[in-house]
Design a protein with these regions (language model features):
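Surface loop/turn signatures of beta-propeller and other carbohydrate-active proteins
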Residues: 87-93, 122-146, 166-173, 179-180, ...
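Conserved Ser/Thr-centered positions that define the repeating blades of beta-propeller domains
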Residues: 111-114, 192, 270-276, 331-334, ...
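Entry beta-strands of beta-propeller and related beta-repeat scaffolds
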Residues: 171-176, 230-234, 310-315, 368-370, ...
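Active-site neighborhood of glycoside hydrolase catalytic domains
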Residues: 307, 333, 373, 377-379, ...
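Residue-level signature of beta-propeller blades and closely related beta-rich strand-turn architectures
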Residues: 181, 238-240, 319-321, 375-377, ...
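Extracellular glycan-recognition regions
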Residues: 1-171, 471, 487-489
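Structural motif
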Residues: 184-190, 243-249, 259-269, 324-331, ...
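Loop/turn-rich, solvent-exposed surfaces of beta-rich toroidal or solenoidal domains
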Residues: 377-384, 389-391, 401-437
Length: 490
């Protein structure tokens, strides 16, 4: 990485392995700073700090003189700068020489310190720095990494390190499942260390209540995706199918059910999750994208993926016009994940136009894209279509892949960490109580039936009757932070 500010020899000297920077000012606003631009959305940076006499020094994320966050020390106490000028002053038990680390995971920051680089003490975690930008503080700067020296004397820095912190499969050690429930129309999360036994966070209660985020006062069909930038992207259907009964509207559906069909609504939700704790939210109105979309009957089950050729996030979903057949469509989204940039295009439609295809789920396996979806060809079940490109040309396969005699929907494919095994999960809604079922494969030809939750090897510990789920990998550290966050809220 390149340093943006060259410090002249009169204020900085290299002595053996330490860079000594003369101090100035009394706050980060007027201190001496050596700045560098981070090249990644998810990264980790650290430096060894040597605090001189009368000096305060440390490691910051710096947008401008009014907007910064990080940790510094005078040798006696740490000073933690949080957004909007908030400060904390925990005691410094490490002395004047210490290591400072910043982990920035999509604008969710962890600050940690260490004496030896082996044992780290977390000072702050899940600190949201997403608001440190030009809309709030003017200018058009980047949120830069800064070495700070203020007060008197000088500060020494050595062993500055920076690395891309987007985890690979080898770094993963846990699984995260998202789902909703019919009785609450809210978002739930469950975590598993082995991919077999899942425990819901927040004691099995919603992590986000649907009536706090959805225009219809309920959400369905949550899906979560980790992008190539390391950020987590969540999408949900803005729909409450019992809204009239629960007193949220006067009619069964938002519009005439005979004309626009079951579950009609023109909206969905697109959310970027910052570090799995903090959220940036957007309600997407597909009916307002163009005059021709004013008569759409539904936008259901949105999922997010990434088109490597386009270099853009892609949302795909079930859509229909009025009460016509449901088909699968896609759109592209801007990099900030808050604006749809294209009009819906056909992704896949069932060869028999009288039947429908819904609930598409795309996964790249090798060089091909495998899309499992729900076919209503006689009954509701799971089929697969395969393509060499992500946004079309999916080949119809007449085979039914689920093992269920009853209706099922919401397929989701996920890989077992470190194994050449893939699990296809789906929602068996045709039974009472409904449940998830699972099959497993290594070649996508032969599938092993793993059964339903709590009827075979797949288990839940504190929840039942989940609806429309999705699973992704987490690192052990991410899983621990997520568990800790919800346990500490009790």
């Amino acid at each position: 990485m390149d340093f943006l500010e060259r410090i002249c020899p009169s204020v900085a000297q290299l002595q053996e392995t330490d860079l000594w920077i003369d101090a100035k000012g009394s706050t980060p606003s007027d201190a001496r700073l050596l700045l560098a631009t981070a090249e990644d959305k998810n990264y980790e940076t650290q430096v060894e700090v040597n605090v001189g006499k009368g000096n305060t020094a440390g490691l910051l994320l710096y947008y401008s003189e009014k907007a910064y966050a990080g940790v510094v020390s005078d040798g006696k106490n740490f000073i933690i700068y949080k957004k909007r000028g908030k400060q904390l002053y925990p005691p410094n038990k490490l002395g004047k020489r210490f290591l400072a680390k910043i982990q920035n995971q999509g604008n969710s920051v962890r600050l940690a310190v260490s004496k030896d680089g082996k044992e780290w003490t977390t000072l702050v975690e899940n600190m949201d720095v997403s608001q440190l930008h030009h809309n709030n503080y003017g200018g058009f700067y980047a949120l830069r990494i800064g070495l700070l020296s203020l007060g008197k004397g000088s500060a020494g820095f050595r062993q500055f390190r920076y690395r891309n912190a987007i985890p690979k499969e080898k770094d993963m050690g846990a699984y995260l499942m998202v789902f909703h429930k019919d009785e609450t129309h809210s978002l739930y999360m469950a975590v598993s260390d082995d991919g077999y036994t899942f425990t819901a966070l927040n004691d099995g209660k919603p992590v986000i209540a649907g009536d706090t985020i959805a225009l219809q006062k309920g959400i369905r069909d949550p899906h979560i995706f980790r992008g190539p930038d390391g950020a987590f992207y969540l999408s949900m259907t803005d729909l409450h199918i019992y809204a009239q009964k629960d007193g949220f509207r006067d009619t069964e559906w938002e519009r005439d059910g005979k004309e626009y069909g079951w579950g009609n609504k023109p909206r969905t939700r697109t959310d970027e999750i910052v570090g799995l704790i903090n959220w940036k939210r957007t309600n997407a109105r597909f009916d307002l994208l163009s005059a021709g979309l004013g008569e759409i009957g539904c936008v259901w089950a949105p999922e997010v993926t990434y088109d490597d050729k386009k270099g853009k996030p892609m949302i795909y979903f079930t859509m229909r016009f009025k009460n016509e057949a449901n088909k699968l469509y896609y759109v592209y989204v801007n990099d900030d994940f808050d604006r749809i940039e294209t009009l819906p295009q056909i992704l896949f439609e069932y060869p028999n136009e009288k039947n429908i295809a819904i609930d598409g789920d795309i996964t790249k396996v090798g060089d091909r894209y495998r899309m499992f979806y729900v076919s209503h060809d006689g009954g509701a079940g799971i089929k697969q279509a395969v393509s060499d490109r992500i946004n079309g040309d999916y080949e119809y396969d007449p085979r039914w892949y689920d093992f269920e005699p009853r209706a099922c929907e919401a397929p989701n494919l996920w890989k077992r960490i470190g194994e050449d095994k893939w699990v296809l999960m789906y929602d068996v809604y045709g039974i009472n109580p409904h449940n998830f079922a699972f099959i497993e494969t290594s070649d996508f030809v032969n599938f092993k039936n793993l059964g339903r939750f709590n009827e075979g090897v797949m288990k839940t510990t504190n929840f039942s009757s989940p609806k429309h789920g999705a699973v992704i990998h987490l690192t052990k550290e991410e899983a621990a932070r997520l568990r800790s966050h919800w346990e500490n809220r009790k």
